[in-house]
Amino acid sequence: ATFRLNNMIEIIQNWNDYILDSKYLPQRSATFLINENNEVPEINVRNNYKGIDQAYRKPIQLRLIQDIEDPNYRQIFILPAASYNLYDGLSLGLRWYNRTILPKPLHFNLEPQYALNSQSPVGRGSVIYNRWNETSNLFLQRFGIAGNYFSYDQGLFYRRLSPYTIFAFRDNSNLRKNKRQYLTLRSVHVTRDKALAQVDREPNYSVYNLQFNYSDNNLINFYSAAFNAQLSSAFSKVSAQFEYRKLFLNNRQINLRFYAGLFLRNGPNPMSSV
């Protein structure tokens, strides 16, 4: 059944039988709702609303502590948050996030806090956007950014910002296979307040990271491999890690792990004397 709504009030109800692909519903300005009374069982009902004129947006609902998702609202969950830092002391605040059991395209997590010792606002936050493609070997693209702001000394603060991108691959012709490949591009940028009476031996820095992960996660035979490359103004290195696990019939298992790394360049940062 298709329900046509006006200001969230039902005005027309249509029953549509034998829709194999798509059907045109002539209406210039309206909001459509399908499967309102759950005649057809489904898990994900959050996309059952569609505003034709794009003016319709689900109302925002604030909930204290995470609860069962309500598909009629854009829910934001609130939790008390606390952290401790030697220079900030006890920091108190609220965590605002929208993560639910079922994944969403857009996730955010914001934790603004107030530090009692430094008497300054501090906190952390992250935003993640997921893009799925169920018909391709590249089944997931994830774009995210995370950051925080805290004290590292009396009256001195640091800022850390880390944007990243993840490409996830699988064999789309056989979804029963557990083989996965992940390509991650990430960078970490740290800036700090500089003390006037102190020579800074660890100045602001940035690290760029390229990582490839392969895994075949099975109960009896497990394989994984990871290749990592890091580059900064002070060093550059590459590393590799391999792991194999075998489960036997007597419930015993053997786990083998190999790791190797090499610094291609490891010297003082040319900016350390500035």
Where are the model-predicted features located?
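Solvent-exposed serine/threonine-rich low-complexity stretches and specific carbohydrate-binding patches
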Residues: 3-16
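Short, solvent-exposed aromatic-acidic interface loops
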Residues: 10-12, 39, 147-148, 190
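A glycine-rich phosphate-binding loop feature that marks nucleotide/adenosyl-phosphate handling sites
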Residues: 49-53, 183-187, 261
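C-terminal outer-membrane beta-barrel translocator/porin domains of Gram-negative envelope proteins
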Residues: 80-82, 140-155, 160-166, 171, ...
